[in-house]
């Protein structure tokens, strides 16, 4: 399998996932080459430019796709940045942490950009980008809060789930403190309820580094 075939397969899987999420048909791009015309879905073409999309709910399928693309792009060039574009309401904490750990694990810097909404785990991953390379578009909204969860069953089962949620809350607060420079105590207070921010407010808070009105 050639490099282009692998790129196509990775991005086509993502395109299919986005269609499954109800985002409609995926546009195609036609390029001319010495061998004639070649058609790419738009995500395959952007993956060639080292752009990865995280759109919609953060779940195991999303995480698997993003992780696979990050690892592939590292193998292609470990010294060139990867861009992660985020428009997500959040979702699974475990899936989000899988993406976070991979972002830290790979050698290339991962720059992050919020387009539209980065909430919950979406905001967490936005803030987890390389320092100095985290940004948002002017009308983006960013929201942080504590992990959500529910439990059913015997009292002992509910107690176990409650301990796990408290552990995850402490772990996420610690990481947010590291990436924002805010004290853990302040993070805990500010995430007690849904906390919405504009791009400029997110810069002041340390979640991102800049608001981009136009590509530089």
Swiss-Prot record:
Active site: which residues? 120 (nucleophile), 145
Protein name in UniProt:
ATP-dependent Clp protease proteolytic subunit
InterPro entries the UniProt entry points to: ClpP, ClpP/crotonase-like_dom_sf, ClpP/TepA, ClpP_His_AS, ClpP_Ser_AS
Q: Which family does it belong to?
A: Belongs to the peptidase S14 family.
Gene source species: Cupriavidus necator (strain ATCC 17699 / DSM 428 / KCTC 22496 / NCIMB 10442 / H16 / Stanier 337) (Ralstonia eutropha)
Q: What the protein does? A: Cleaves peptides in various proteins in a process that requires ATP hydrolysis. Has a chymotrypsin-like activity. Plays a major role in the degradation of misfolded proteins.
Provide the protein's localization. Cytoplasm
Q: What is its EC number?
A: 3.4.21.92
- GO biological process terms on file: protein quality control for misfolded or incompletely synthesized proteins
Give any GO molecular function from the UniProt entry. Answer: ATPase binding
Keywords, alphabetical:
Cytoplasm, Hydrolase, Protease, Serine protease
Asked whether the keyword Protease is assigned, the reply is: yes
How does this polypeptide assemble, per the annotation?
A: Fourteen ClpP subunits assemble into 2 heptameric rings which stack back to back to give a disk-like structure with a central cavity, resembling the structure of eukaryotic proteasomes.
Top enzyme class, one word, equals hydrolase
Which PROSITE patterns does the record cross-reference, listed alphabetically? Answer: CLP_PROTEASE_HIS, CLP_PROTEASE_SER
Q: What is the lineage of its organism?
A: Bacteria, Pseudomonadati, Pseudomonadota, Betaproteobacteria, Burkholderiales
Which reaction(s) does its UniProt entry say it catalyses? Hydrolysis of proteins to small peptides in the presence of ATP and magnesium. alpha-casein is the usual test substrate. In the absence of ATP, only oligopeptides shorter than five residues are hydrolyzed (such as succinyl-Leu-Tyr-|-NHMec, and Leu-Tyr-Leu-|-Tyr-Trp, in which cleavage of the -Tyr-|-Leu- and -Tyr-|-Trp bonds also occurs)
Q: Name one GO cellular component term.
A: cytoplasm
